[in-house]
Amino acid sequence: VKTTQRWTARWATLALAAAAVSAQAGTLVINTDASDPAPKAAWDAMVKGFMAANPDVTVKVNTFDHEGFKTSIRNFLTADPPDIVTWYAGNRMAPFVNANLFDDVSDVWKKEGLGDKLKSAAASMTIKGKQWGVPYTYYQWGIYYRKDIFEKNNIAVPTTWKELVAACATLKKAGVTPFAIGTKALWPTGGWFDYLNMRVNGYEFHMDLTAGKVPYTDKRVQAVFDRWDELTKPGYFLANHAGIDWQDAVPAFVKGEAAMYLMGNFAVDPMKKAGLTEDQLGFMQFPKINDVPMAEDAPTDTIHIPARAKNKADARRFLAYAASAKVQTEVNAILGQLPVNKDATKPSDTYLKDGFAMLSGAYALGQFYDRDAPAEMAKAGMEGFQRYMVKPESRKEVLERLESVRKRVYK
């Protein structure tokens, strides 16, 4: 009996070892924070499609809630890495790249021709000349405007800063607040700073600033606030914006009390539900200010291979699959967002169609101030932007405070 038990134990050990090897070779472990209904459905569809196309691979998905994922990602990348992990582009990706926790996937980009297909997101996926993941979905930011109010006041869609400021003056004179905004939650101010900085100083400067490489007291940052002054000082934003959230500013826009709204495309749904039609609601690109390439804010969700992943070969197959035009078309139809692959089928929705055209031709993509800057800097920055918008004369004091925070945060 003892001999039988010994053999049984030995065979069990061998079987477990064999299972571990086969799990490593044919199992792909994915950690994601796609816990909301639409992202979860999109990931379910993507995984199902991948397994159908690659029957030799079994995919295991671990889904975390957003906050839990953010706090545990560094731990599992170090201690028990999956084969695929979801994250974000730009400066949010940089700490993991710099800590050697993400794998260089430039080979996938080269093999699949992604430098061309994913061109708009290439800069935000590149560090030290190498690519560190694949983007699969994003959405546009821009200015939503009331076509009917523009028409009534003989305003053409502005494409330059001078034209935008002139349109604001015309609207104000007609008793219409030029811009709806609600800054109670602070982050909407980040969109304004992003666009003004990217249009005044360009994408590279904006990335350097949010990475802590430039003082907030720099004259180039002062130049951003010179432009912002042209909107804050004449009262071109809703007067009570610090006391309301972004959703609470939608009614003023719908009633025609305000004519424009700088916001992400997620705002279209509440605008339509409140009664605006496509004849009334238009979308435009944030106008040109200085002669710099036009970058856009487009928060981008990305897929990465941990540096210590066990099954990198199948992980690379998954990245190539997720980058394809067909898959990005299908996944984004579920998400109600935009495919990054420029060869994907154009969306039928008017505003997504406008966004797809704009982002496909973008020079580069910002991820939004609170993604591009570290949490402590982003919080202080957006508090400062709100204070400045309420009280433009506080500008000097605000920028000096932000500079002291920058020195502390980026030690």
Regions found by a protein language model. Name each.
Residues 88-141, 165, 192-194, 220, ...:
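Hinge/lid segment of periplasmic solute-binding proteins
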Residues 170, 210-241:
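Glycine-centered hinge/linker elements that transmit conformational signals in sensory
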Residues 52-53, 58, 151, 360-411:
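Conserved C-terminal helix/tail region of periplasmic/extracytoplasmic solute-binding proteins
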Residues 93-101, 121-157, 184-209, 297-306, ...:
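Periplasmic solute-binding protein
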Residues 48, 52-53, 153, 226, ...:
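Extracytoplasmic/periplasmic substrate-recognition and gating elements
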Residues 82-83, 113-149, 177-180, 293-294, ...:
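A structural signal for short loop-to-beta-strand junctions that line the ligand-binding cleft
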Residues 45-117, 124-126, 148-159, 259-260, ...:
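Extracytoplasmic "Venus flytrap"/periplasmic binding protein-like
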Residues 117-123, 284, 332-380, 387, ...:
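Long, aromatic- and glycine/proline-rich binding clefts that accommodate carbohydrate-like moieties
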